[in-house]
């Protein structure tokens, strides 16, 4: 049986590397912020959309647009204009004989996933990210402990390919969570980076896979720009070194999030409820 496969290619500018065919569909992310710019393809500012939030949500505005506006799609994905998953259309169809999701190969951190999240945000933002998750999903405490504090691997870029039902389940988890977190972050201005919610979503993808027990396949990423993560043997050696350091040196003394410190005190002193932490 044939399936309707659509993979959105998030782009904010014209580039000859942008893939465009019956499967790969370019989408202009943040179109609402730049109405004067016409890239000649679909914008994320039509129908039900959050295009104006692109500065903080990054490529997630394309994901939201697909969730709310695409119809009759069996398999949906998201790539970047210079980065996509290295998998053929035939292999995509073979995998989706059953439900599941395809993600980029995991990035190996030197620390646990929570500490890595702190390095991308502020400490206050990271605390609120975990506390908001616990408020909305109190049954997820075990998954949070395993994924954020006992693991050093996660998939980056917010790229994926999924059957529509799995995609709908993830979006139904992700966007209410991000909107709630965005509201909490806007009360005190803790954000130092506009792209904070995009970074949070990268971490949440892997958490949700752990929490929802989704069938998953990991594939390499094709990066048409110089990759900050390395390639080939050099990358494998680096990943092994980081894993050994994490298991032998970091994990034994960091299994509990003891290092909230002044950030947690500062949040509470401003009357912000973080009692789940």
State where each predicted segment sits.
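ER/Golgi luminal nucleotide-sugar-dependent glycosyltransferases, focusing on the catalytic module
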Residues: 1-277
